[in-house]
Amino acid sequence: RLKPGPKFWAVFYSALGFFQLGWPALAGSAAATLLGAYMGRMPGAPDQATQAWVASALVLAVVLILSFGGTIERMLEYFAWTMLAVVFLFLVTVNVLFVPFSHWATTFTGFFQFSGIPHPIDWGLIGALAATAGSGGIGNLTVTNWVRDKGFGMGSKVGAIPSAVGGHRIQLSRVGTVFPATPENLVRWREWLRYVHADQVWVWALFCFLGMFLNVNLATAIVPHGTDLQGLAAGAYQAQYLSLIWPGFWFLTLFNGFWILFKTQ
């Protein structure tokens, strides 16, 4: 609808989507985490070739996962539920066992307070924060594909994306479908809105907050205040300090981080 026209915007947003979601940055981070869990240390410059091979294998694994399973959304759903259970079980366990409950209150109130601007200001970090927040535009569009493939609302009328192997042919409409505004359809529409509100408030918002809370609560409790967190090693500080309690936590913590990165990929 906007100039210079649909052909330009199709290419423009496809390029943005590729650099945000298709560029294998998450695969590289997941590979570093997996290698760190295996080697007992975070990979460095001598390990770059190995890390690149592991990252390539992870990208290939994602392609294979999406190639099977009837419809893509069903395979993604199986993996998402499994990974969600693994991540939250680990985070809840270590928080309950090793973080004093008085610290839980401090972390919770910190979500509603502003402690000031750090000095010196790291504008690169602030820019990355702003970019991550803004990236939800295209990212959320990809989530709507799952809603459509699941058949929610009018999604059942426009088809789904079949997997390359094992999926039966499903005709996918290029345009949306609007229901006639009859009294019966409006009743169904209001019912779907209740599902949407429950999903956004209780599933999406609540679990996003819990995920942030548990990670921040653990990090601020076990990592000494003022620790300089830089580079790939920044993701290993929780594993390092938890391993002082029990060496096995090095692997478990990094493997948990790997699940998070791999699921996002």
Which residue stretches match the model-derived regions?
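Junctions where cytoplasmic loops transition into the N-terminal start of transmembrane alpha-helices
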Residues: 143, 147-148, 153-208
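Select transmembrane alpha-helical segments in multipass membrane proteins
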Residues: 4-18, 53-59, 118-130, 209, ...
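Hydrophobic alpha-helical segments and their helix-loop junctions in multi-pass secondary transporters
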Residues: 85-121, 126-145
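Flexible loop linkers connecting adjacent transmembrane helices
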Residues: 1-8, 31-45, 70-75, 224-245
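Membrane-water interface at loop-to-transmembrane-helix junctions
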Residues: 121-123, 182-209, 238-259
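Hydrophobic transmembrane alpha-helices that form the core helical bundles
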Residues: 7-44, 55-56, 264-265
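Membrane-water interface regions at transmembrane-helix termini and the short interhelical loops
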Residues: 37, 41, 60-81, 94-101, ...
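Extracellular/periplasmic helix-exit of transmembrane alpha-helices
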Residues: 173, 177-181, 185-187, 208-237
